[in-house]
Amino acid sequence: MKINGIAHIALSVSDIENSKIFYKDLLSFLGLSLVHESKKSCYHVGGRTGVLIQQITKDESCGSFSQNNVGLHHLCFRLISKNNVDELVAKLKKMSANILRGPLNGPWVPGYYYVLFEDPDGIRLEANYVPHKGVFEKNVKFNSAGDY
C-alpha cells in the first residue's frame, strides 16, 4: 500500500465567524475553493488538499492553542515557487496576519524557503517552497537542527 497524500485537515477554532474571514481570504488566495459552509464550519478544497474549519464546543475546550501541547504543532502548505511565498507574505500583510518569521531560507534542506504565521487563534501555519525533490533529492539529508 502507498499513501496518496493527506486528504484533509480539520482545525478547531474559538470564533468561527472571525476564523471564516481569515481562512476564506487565505485559502482562496492559495487556490482552494469553498465547497461547504454552515453556521459552525467551512470546508475548502483544492490541489488535492482539504481544510475544514470548525467551531469548538466551549465546554470541551482545554484552553488556547499551543504548538507544544499534544496534537498539532503546525500546518504547512507547499507552494510551487519562491515567488509564491513572497506573494503570500504580501497578502498576509494586507490581512494583518501575525507573521512570526519570514520569508527566509530554512536550514532543513537546500533551497527551503518559507513564512511562518498564525491564524486568529494562534494556530501556527507555514507556507514553503522546496526546490526539486527536497529530502528525496540524491545526497540530501534532512537537517533537524532548525527551529520549527
Question: Where are the model-predicted features located?
Answer:
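N-terminal beta-strand motif that seeds the catalytic metal site of vicinal oxygen chelate
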Residues: 1-20, 75, 131-148
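Short glycine-enriched loop/turn motifs at secondary-structure junctions
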Residues: 3-5, 68-72, 109
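Core segments of cupin and vicinal oxygen chelate
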Residues: 10-55
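Vicinal oxygen chelate
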Residues: 13-18, 75-121
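Long, continuous compositionally biased terminal/linker segments
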Residues: 45-80, 86-90, 94-95
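A short, acidic/glycine-rich surface segment
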Residues: 58-64, 102, 134-136
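Short beta->alpha transition motifs characteristic of CBS
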Residues: 110, 116, 127-134
